[in-house]
């Protein structure tokens, strides 16, 4: 019994440091919001302008790594001895489901507006050229390049899971081949894990900070309840309580059902927007944007705007590359878990094709709808953002569709379910990562899961109190910096170990 308690308890060296660090940062921020905003702007400017190039080179090098995996000596190596656990159709569907978070719904609807109003390459705002490049940049930021980088890490984790039979719940577990067992399980490994956890906590908090206003703005539209910070806090609190009830009452099956409902509802809502918004225009705009992407791809890959200093690559490309970096380990572990029995080539191709299709469908349909509403003068997005918040502008892009009440109910339910599953996943991932070994079929302790969901909720509220997108962007970029190095170490550790255990025959 004592041994069981020890196994299911927290791991102090990776539980308390992130808790203390995040708690202090939240306290300092709330203590003086104005001073915090000054610091946030300074951090954002420093990281993006001084180190933005490093994020761009990271993505490019990882892209070459994807080609090496697909066409190199390990392409036909199987990740585990068993047959694939899921059919190809189910496998692709689970990938799509992982893309339909409320944060994705946030960016998919509004991102194109920012690209058109503050375009790259010195283009005139709101010009024809800006509109032509707008969706192309969304396809770039959410296309094959970032998914190729994820596929490399997914192969690495699948290798450690199913070939080396390692129980990986923290990144330090994968570093034994690179730095040795003494360092991986010692102070160095603890530091790596703490970097990972602090960054992951802030990433999840930012996702909640993006998702919550969508729900509260839906409530204002549907029920006339004014959107305030207090309402945001109440909604987040309700989600945390709901998550605690689900965990305490063993309703995890219900959460999984909700996740499936979210996926099916996403298909339904996207199909509705595609049909009523203008299917012909959407397909034409997508086709044109793919051409623009191919035409400008070399420049997009290396674009830092060092001479023009317009700030577009720093504000968007570097931000999104940091977004991808910060979620890489968590997402890659999930994708590796569902890819047992597949070959390296199959995993790499499946991820890039399946996940690119998912994100391209989302961004094309939602972005095209926003552009049409702007061109037809149905929505004045700058005015909506100035007078209200960004989330209000997003809500209005949905409310402008036919059968607006039914559409808004569908969007409200989708955002609500997406956020419930987000908090559940956040608390589970953080609890698993900060507890001692949890056996297969066991759940991490209830209080630990609730505690982490509360902390993530607090971060979401703090970011909402700061206002605007810059605090959210800065939290992602600052968190992405340490994980930049962690991801590289995991990759190098895999390459070093695979040379020994996957020798060419």
UniProtKB/Swiss-Prot annotation:
A single BP term in Gene Ontology: carnitine metabolic process
Pathway per the UniProt entry: Amine and polyamine metabolism; carnitine metabolism
InterPro entries: BCCT_CS (IPR018093), BCCT_transptr (IPR000060), BCCT_transptr_CaiT (IPR023449)
Origin superkingdom: Bacteria
Pfam families per the UniProt record, alphabetical: BCCT
Primary localization: membrane
Compartment(s) of residence: Cell inner membrane
Subunit composition and interactions: Homotrimer.
Function summary: Catalyzes the exchange of L-carnitine for gamma-butyrobetaine.
UniProt-recorded name of the protein: L-carnitine/gamma-butyrobetaine antiporter
Species whose genome carries this gene: Salmonella gallinarum (strain 287/91 / NCTC 13346)
């Amino acid at each position: 019994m004592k041994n069981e308690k020890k196994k299911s308890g927290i791991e102090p060296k990776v539980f308390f440091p992130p808790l203390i660090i995040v708690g202090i940062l939240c306290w300092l921020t709330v203590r003086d919001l104005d001073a915090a905003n000054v610091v946030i702007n300074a951090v954002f400017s420093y990281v993006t302008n001084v180190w933005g190039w490093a994020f761009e080179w990271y993505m490019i090098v990882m892209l070459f790594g994807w080609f090496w995996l697909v066409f190199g000596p390990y392409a036909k190596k199987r990740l585990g001895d068993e047959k694939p656990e899921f059919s190809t159709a189910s496998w692709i569907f689970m990938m799509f489901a992982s893309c339909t978070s409320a944060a994705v719904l946030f960016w998919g609807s509004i991102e194109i507006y920012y690209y058109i109003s503050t375009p790259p390459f010195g283009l005139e705002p709101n010009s024809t050229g800006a509109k032509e490049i707008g969706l192309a940049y969304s396809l770039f930021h959410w296309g094959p390049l970032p998914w190729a980088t994820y596929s490399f890490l997914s192969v690495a984790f699948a290798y450690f899971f199913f070939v080396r039979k390692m129980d990986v719940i923290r990144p330090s577990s994968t570093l034994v081949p690179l730095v040795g067992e003494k360092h991986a399980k010692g102070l160095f490994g603890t530091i790596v894990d703490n970097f990972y956890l602090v960054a992951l906590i802030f990433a999840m908090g930012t996702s909640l900070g993006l998702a919550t206003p969508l729900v509260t703005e839906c409530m204002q539209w549907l029920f006339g309840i004014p959107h305030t910070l207090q309402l945001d806090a109440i909604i987040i609190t309700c989600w945390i309580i709901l998550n605690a009830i689900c965990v305490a009452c063993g309703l995890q099956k219900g959460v999984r059902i909700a996740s499936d409902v979210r996926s099916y509802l996403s298909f339904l809502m996207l199909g509705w927007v595609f049909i009523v918004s203008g299917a012909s225009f959407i397909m034409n705009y997508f086709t044109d944007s793919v051409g623009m992407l191919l035409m400008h791809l070399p420049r997009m890959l290396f674009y830092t705007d060092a001479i023009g200093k317009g700030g577009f690559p720093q504000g968007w490309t570097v931000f999104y590359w940091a977004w991808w970096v910060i979620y890489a380990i968590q997402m890659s572990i999930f994708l590796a878990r569902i890819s047992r029995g597949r070959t390296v080539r199959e995993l790499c191709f499946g991820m890039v094709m399946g996940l690119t299709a998912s994100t391209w469908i989302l961004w094309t349909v939602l972005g095209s709808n926003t552009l049409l509403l702007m061109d037809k003068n149905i929505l004045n997005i700058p005015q909506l953002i100035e007078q209200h918040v960004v989330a209000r502008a997003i809500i209005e892009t949905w409310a402008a569709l036919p059968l607006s009440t039914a559409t808004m109910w569908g969007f409200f339910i989708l955002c609500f379910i997406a956020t419930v599953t987000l908090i559940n996943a956040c608390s589970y991932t953080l609890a698993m990562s900060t507890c001692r070994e949890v056996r297969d079929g066991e759940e991490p302790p209830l209080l630990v899961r609730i505690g982490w969901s509360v902390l993530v909720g607090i971060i979401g509220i703090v970011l909402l109190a700061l206002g605007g997108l810059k605090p959210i962007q800065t939290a992602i970029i600052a968190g992405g910096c340490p994980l930049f190095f962690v991801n590289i170490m995991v990759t190098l550790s895999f390459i070093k170990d695979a040379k020994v255990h996957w020798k060419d025959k």
